[in-house]
């Protein structure tokens, strides 16, 4: 419900965020990887079925591949799935997104942002009319389940890049939190707040 509401607010106001969501491993037939229901998939179907969007982009920057979304939408040309994730992390067997970018272990800020900019330029050639952004902070260097080495500032730069890229094009934008398993709970909250503050 939260991501459906957030997507409706994004249609009305241009940008919104759900302070949860991003359960991108759940599929039609059940949950997986700490994800019970795939909120982004439900919200995307809601928008499409009501004619509120015609071409949706899912930008998934969680450290884990968004295999649930890639499976759910693999035959749906109205939804484009983009996942940039750790090559060696969960799930062991990856699904095929419309665009997958696999990152090597221990990747740091500069290479991460450079890679993201490159693929954003490709995505900007398409005519999307709605964007979901899964802003997992498990790319952080201190995350228990991540394998990348992205700093606090790197996460802030990532979120700024994504929000500014689509907001400047006046494409309705809905952000959700995604994964985060930092050993320090207060740090985890601060990292997730990056998206909220920027939006």
Language-model-derived ranges and their functions:
Residues 1-199:
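A general "terminal functional-core" signal
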């Amino acid at each position: 419900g939260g991501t459906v509401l957030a997507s409706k607010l994004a249609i009305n106001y241009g940008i919104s965020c759900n302070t949860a969501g991003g359960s991108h491993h759940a599929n039609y037939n059940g949950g997986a990887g700490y994800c019970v229901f795939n909120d982004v998939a439900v919200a995307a179907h809601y928008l499409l079925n009501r004619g509120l969007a015609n071409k949706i982009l899912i930008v998934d920057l969680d450290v884990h591949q968004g295999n649930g979304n890639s499976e759910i939408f693999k035959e749906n040309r109205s939804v484009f799935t983009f996942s940039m994730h750790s090559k060696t992390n969960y799930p062991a067997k990856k699904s095929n997104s419309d665009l997958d970018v696999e990152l090597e272990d221990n990747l740091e800020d500069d290479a991460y942002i450079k890679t993201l900019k490159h693929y954003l330029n490709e995505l900007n050639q398409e005519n999307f009319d709605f964007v979901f952004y899964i802003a997992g902070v498990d790319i952080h260097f201190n995350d228990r389940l991540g394998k990348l080495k992205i700093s606090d500032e790197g996460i802030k730069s990532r979120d700024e890049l994504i929000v500014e890229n689509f907001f400047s094009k006046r494409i309705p934008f809905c952000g959700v939190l995604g994964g985060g398993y930092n050993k320090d709970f207060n740090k985890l909250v601060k990292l997730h707040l990056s998206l909220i503050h920027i939006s």
